[in-house]
């Protein structure tokens, strides 16, 4: 079972998503995208696989967003991708790729939609929120 996560270890949502993947018994390929950003083609493929607009992958609460005036609706998709490649911190995360699909996992529970294997046991997020019970079932 091949799973890849575009991960930022400084992000709680990314850490929780990685932990949910591991709670399913899988050990994913981890791409630290701030250190090793995707290529232009890879980024385009990820966006297409998620079926989201380019702008939906753009982080807004980081300094380059304001400095580059990215809130303005004057940039093409290609220009937005250029900005994300020049400033990988602008790429929202975590992105997870599995045989069942590709998702921007915000919130982290989105990963459950595409994991090939069920959860193996209880899971509690870093903030204390119970997500999975002892039987491996989603807590509503």
Regions found by a protein language model. Name each.
Residues 44, 82, 109:
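Active-site phosphate/pyrophosphate- and oxyanion-stabilizing loops and adjacent acidic/basic residues
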Residues 65, 73-88:
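Thioredoxin-like thiol-disulfide oxidoreductase module
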